[in-house]
Each structure stands twice: as structure tokens, then as C-alpha cells.
Amino acid sequence: MPRRPIQKKRSVLPDPIYNSISVHMLVNRVMKNGKKSLAYKIVYNTLKNIGETTQQNPVEVFEAALENVMPKVEVQPRRRAGSVQMVPSILRSTERGQATALRWILESCEKKSAKSMVSKLQTEILDAYEKKGNAIKKKEELHKIAANNAMYSNRPQIILNAVSIVS
């Protein structure tokens, strides 16, 4: 039994304009050095531009893009018999998958060579919405690794089913 008291799960409040938790998570990920107002400007300008280009609700486009990038499995390195094996497991928590998807989207934004973060984030979200781009490639790579290493899992068939449904 742990001596430390169990930490309560921190509740994330939705953002003030779009009233969406995933948008607020994006703002917190974009924020650097505590400059939250700048992060809000970047994200809101990005969503405004997405709404103008697609003629759809920008939050729905963003959440669909997030759903497209979100992985269904994860791989964890385990040491067995002197060698390190990547053992896949299914992601049951959507928050963990969302955090991974946001991280991948922002990493691929930083690799792009555009002038502003707004334009980079907009192109990456639209690419993820159309199921192309670097973040989607990263998800497919992870699912390929999980399918190849499914034999190391306790239930390999469940891993293969989760990966094949997505692909």
C-alpha cells in the first residue's frame, strides 16, 4: 500500500470561446514560457483560418483531425531474456491518446518551414483532417510496430484487431 496519498485527477476546464476541452489542451501545448495569451492568439487565429478555408465549424474539423491522428495502441519497451522488446498494449484512455496526438501534431508543425506558427498549425490540422501529413505517418508507423510485435503482448489478437480496424 502506498504511503503517499493518491493524487486526485486534475479536471481540465474548457476554453472560454469555443467551450471545448481539446482546444484548451491544444492551447496548453502551444504555450511556451508561460505566455498563455500568445498561445490563445495562435490557436484562435488558426481555428478562424480553418473555418474560413473549409466553410465548416473549426472545432469539429480540429476534433476530427485529432481523432484521425489519435493512436489506438501504444508500445512500451520491456526487457525480456536480455533483450529489449517493444510490447504493444491498447490505449483505453482517450485523454492519453489525445495528448499523444497533440504532441505529434505540434512536433510536425515545428519541422515545417513556414513563416508563422499559425500557418504551420493550420496546414498540419488540415492535413490530419484529410488523413495525410507527418502526424498520420507517425501514427501508421506506431501501428506497424505494434502489429509486428503483437506476439509479445498478452493478447495479440486484440492488438491486431485494433490496428487493422484503424488502417
UniProtKB/Swiss-Prot annotation:
Its main location: plastid. Keywords: Chloroplast, Plastid, Ribonucleoprotein, Ribosomal protein, RNA-binding, rRNA-binding. Belongs to the universal ribosomal protein uS7 family. SUPFAM superfamilies: Ribosomal protein S7 (SSF47973). Gene3D superfamilies: Ribosomal protein S7 domain (1.10.455.10). InterPro entries: Ribosomal_uS7, Ribosomal_uS7_bac/org-type, Ribosomal_uS7_dom, Ribosomal_uS7_dom_sf. One of its GO terms (molecular function) is rRNA binding. It comes from the Eukaryota. It is found in: Plastid, Chloroplast. Coiled coil: none annotated. One of the primary rRNA binding proteins, it binds directly to 16S rRNA where it nucleates assembly of the head domain of the 30S subunit. The keyword Ribosomal protein applies. One of its GO terms (cellular component) is chloroplast. GO terms for biological process: translation. This is Small ribosomal subunit protein uS7c. The keyword Ribosomal protein applies. Part of the 30S ribosomal subunit. CDD domains: uS7_Chloroplast.
